Design a protein with these regions (language model features):
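Flexible glycine-rich surface loops and low-complexity tracts that mediate binding to linear polymers
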Residues: 145-146
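Feature responds to low-complexity, polar/acidic, surface-exposed segments characteristic
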Residues: 1-2, 6-65, 73-135, 149-175
Length: 175
């Protein structure tokens, strides 16, 4: 988590008494937190914060509108209904892995099913053994994100990390 923070790909939830970042790694993320973590892990946090609301959902808190809008516009997330995102619902491992597979260029329906992304995630190398498929705390989201940095984009030899370097999210030396 600290390494992702150094790359501005993961921020945490606050500051502890000792001044260190509170990543709250033992708690399961909500769907809106999972999407926020995903967008930041793609180096698009600043862009998302500036993005106007474009999603159709009525249950997204104002602070997250840009993140959900970015992810929705990019086809990385969908709602739980036409106007419901399920913002405060607990994000499952299948949800986060699906978000990350979409970010790597894979399409649910064509390449995998959203509720069972495990086989493709294993093939892509984004599912470390430590990830608990049934109980998915923020620590597991960090593990999937770290693994995804080394995963190749669909139909490309470029890894997600290389894509982020090419976009200027961080330098090769910082990585």
């Amino acid at each position: 988590a600290a390494q992702l923070k150094e790359l501005d790909l993961f921020l945490g939830v606050g500051v502890l008494e000792d001044g260190s970042t509170d990543f709250d790694l033992d708690r399961a993320p909500s769907r809106v937190e999972a999407v926020t973590m995903l967008v930041r892990s793609l180096g698009k946090g600043v862009q998302a914060e500036l993005q106007p609301k474009t999603h159709p959902f009525t249950d997204v808190p104002a602070w997250a509108d840009g993140y959900v809008s970015y992810a929705y516009d990019q086809g990385l997330t969908k709602g739980t209904a036409d106007t419901a995102f399920g913002a405060e619902d607990t994000a499952t491992g299948a949800m986060y892995v699906t978000f990350m597979l979409r970010a790597l260029g894979y399409a649910d329906g064509a390449d995998f099913t959203w509720d069972s992304p495990w086989s493709l995630a294993e093939d892509c190398g984004i599912l470390p053994e430590i990830v608990d498929r049934n109980n998915f705390p923020r620590a597991d989201a960090v593990a999937v994100t770290c693994a995804a940095l080394f995963a190749e984009q669909k139909d490309s030899n470029d890894t997600l990390a290389q894509k982020l370097v090419d976009r200027g999210a961080f330098s090769q030396a910082e990585f």
